[in-house]
Amino acid sequence: MILEKIKKPNDIHKIPLEDFEPLAAEIRDFLIRSVSRTGGHLASNLGVVELTLALHNVLDFPEDKLIWDVGHQAYTHKILTGRKDEFNNLRQEGGLSGFPKRSESPCDAYDAGHSSNSISAGLGYVHARDILGQKHHVVSVIGDGALTGGMAYEALNNAAELKTNFIIIINDNNMSISRNVGGMSTYLSALRTAEAYTGMKMGVTKALKKVPKVGTALVDTMRKTKSSVKQLFIPGMLFENMGLTYLGPVDGHNMRQMMKLFNEAKRVEGPVVVHVLTKKGRGYEPASAHPDRFHGTGPFDIKTGRVLQKKTVPGYTDVFSKALVSLGEKNKKLTAITAAMPDGTGLVEFSRRFPDRFFDVGIAEEHAVSFAAGLALGGLVPVVAIYSSFLQRAVDQILHDVCMQKLHVIFAVDRAGLVGADGETHQGCFDLSYLSMMPNMTVLAPKNDRELEEMLAFAVSFDGPIAIRYPRGSAHQGLQEYQAPVEYGRSEIIRKGKKIAVLGVGSMIPSCMEICKGLKDDGYDPTFVNARFVKPLDVDLLDELAKDHSLFVTVEENVKSGGYGEHVSAYMEACHPEIRVLSAAVWDRFVPQGNVESLRSRIGLGVEDIRQAIEDSEELREQ
């Protein structure tokens, strides 16, 4: 096998060009077999095999810097830089990351995970290179989906001032996770039909440069003049009108064409955009036919493409989806907004039922929130459904545009808490802190599926900014017998005891059930509280519990700083300083990839870790 010859960075340079096609086939076969066992991002990686091979052919690692936007499509890059044998532990605890990671290899220039930042990072690398007098190449690879994010345009605007080489590759597969939306998608679609442009332009440029004495001046004039040849053949060339050279489009599965164009791009004195057309899921029919299903997949059967582990109970996203549709039938003002993830956030059915009240704004979380503010001011009730780790990209808009105006915007914060295999960039461990600090914001977390439905109905009837956070995975089915109505700022007592009060938040309620059971088995009589409201605190309940308890234990899947436990602790310190508060939370760290239960134990949030900390506390030892 040709693939076996690649053991370290730049081994690809030893492979003859005629072997690149069979090598691409071997890599695809390896990716399909490997991801079918571990799960991972498949469709995007199958789409960039030839693109990555072509880049590695014209670049030298780690001297040259290759920055992947989002980074989930970097599997072939990892293989070509000597990490093939680590794919058995892809996205597992202590194993190979599903994203570029500088600590993993010097060939990974930038830790990635979120969208639309690669051009900014690349531009920083370019200026550092030039200031330090270095000569390496810097390449940012950004998908057409990521170009729906405004940060990419901020960077393109800034890059236009460059006078030195910077290569920006647009990996255009007409998809983000779901199908792309917006003006840039339409614009790139038009460019796909204009393949003759690049060849014609480069030919004209070379011919003009050969004109004695005035050739270079003619080229400069052509670039600056609005009536230049690009305007005749492709009116409104966005990139060139911004001051960036545009090359393409080129077939992203024709390696010789790409190598030729990439080498041409390396010679451009200034920023250059290379437009590459790829097909998500290429080489594996199930992924090609359904790229959204194979964006991020669990282990699957290669023959059928079916995921091996089927859900036995609905997930929280499913519960949210069904409840929102039901509410949408009753309330014609209810609208739903997603940032390029209608399937992941459970809005597909809402979009089908109420297409005029559904908005996919692209990978543009900041815009999504300010857009929701406008909808609210116009008399509608917007629901913004976004993953916790992505919502943090819009903190200023939530604070300034929604909370400051006290607008009725509902935030459905999906994937809150630990999410597992996607690691540091995707763990939703900060939302309670950044949402709770905002004036006028109300924050809730449900204990089970039914409570999520009730909280969503409460949020629709509420008048003000409100966020409901819920975790990834199966919705908790327990505690159905506890059905106290959701009342503003009120927690729920599941069990009344004495001395120890365990106060759990949302996703940690099942763990709190086990903690209380363990304490009872050890002879204690704990009170068990479902917090429900993280903000505002149920201070009346805290005051009541202070009468016959000496230890409060808060349990949350959020960073300790600014979280529920810290707010409880601050209140008790001010009003009941004799009572100790033990906070079980994520301490000051980024949580790596791994199985959620294993990660909880690793960071001190396991059931036994918390129970033991309670029983070891001074308050209990003194009793």
Which sequence ranges carry the predicted segments?
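Structural signature of the thiamine diphosphate
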Residues: 218-286, 408-413, 432-481, 607-623
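N-terminal amphipathic, basic-rich helices that act as targeting or association modules
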Residues: 1-80, 244-259, 275-278
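A glycine-rich helix N-cap at a beta->alpha junction
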Residues: 86-96, 161-175, 196-199, 403-415
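Non-catalytic terminal/interface segments that mediate subunit docking, oligomerization
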Residues: 65, 278-391, 397-407, 464, ...
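Long, well-ordered, tryptophan-enriched scaffold segments
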Residues: 3, 174-320
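Cofactor-binding active-site loop characterized by glycine-rich and histidine/acidic residues
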Residues: 41-162, 316, 333-334, 338-339, ...
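Peripheral docking tails and interdomain loops at the edges
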Residues: 299-303, 307-312, 420-422, 442, ...
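Glycine-/acidic-rich phosphate or pyrophosphate-binding loops and their flanking alpha/beta elements
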Residues: 260-263, 295-296, 305, 315-330, ...
